[in-house]
């Protein structure tokens, strides 16, 4: 039996398309903060890279952000900074 060693680097073929989904309470600072975090590690975001949706009751806002990921280190850094942000409830 052959064992295949899969690492996070082999699961992705960098650079690659990658979607980040972020959910947080709807407030004025949420969008600015999310964009600022993602743009630390990527080029400036263009409006066509972002999809925004309000929750059914309007209390939450979700963002789907499309980026071209260059490495696993980049993805881990974005994910960690978003998780550390007090305005963000979930990161997928």
From Swiss-Prot:
Pfam families the record matches: DUF493
GO cellular component, one term: cytosol
InterPro entries named in the record: UPF0250_YbeD-like, YbeD-like_sf
SUPFAM superfamilies membership: YbeD/HP0495-like
Coiled-coil boundaries: none
HAMAP family, alphabetized: UPF0250
Entry's family note: Belongs to the UPF0250 family.
Record's protein name: UPF0250 protein Rmag_0541
Source species of the chain: Ruthia magnifica subsp. Calyptogena magnifica
């Amino acid at each position: 039996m052959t064992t295949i060693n899969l690492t996070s680097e082999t699961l992705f073929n960098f650079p690659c398309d990658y979607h980040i989904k972020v959910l947080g309470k709807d407030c004025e600072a949420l969008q600015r903060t999310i964009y600022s975090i993602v743009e630390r590690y990527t080029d400036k975001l263009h409006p066509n890279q972002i999809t925004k949706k309000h929750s059914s009751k309007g209390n939450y806002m979700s963002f789907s952000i499309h980026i071209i990921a260059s490495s696993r280190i980049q993805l881990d850094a974005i994910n960690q900074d978003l998780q550390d942000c007090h305005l963000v409830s979930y990161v997928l």
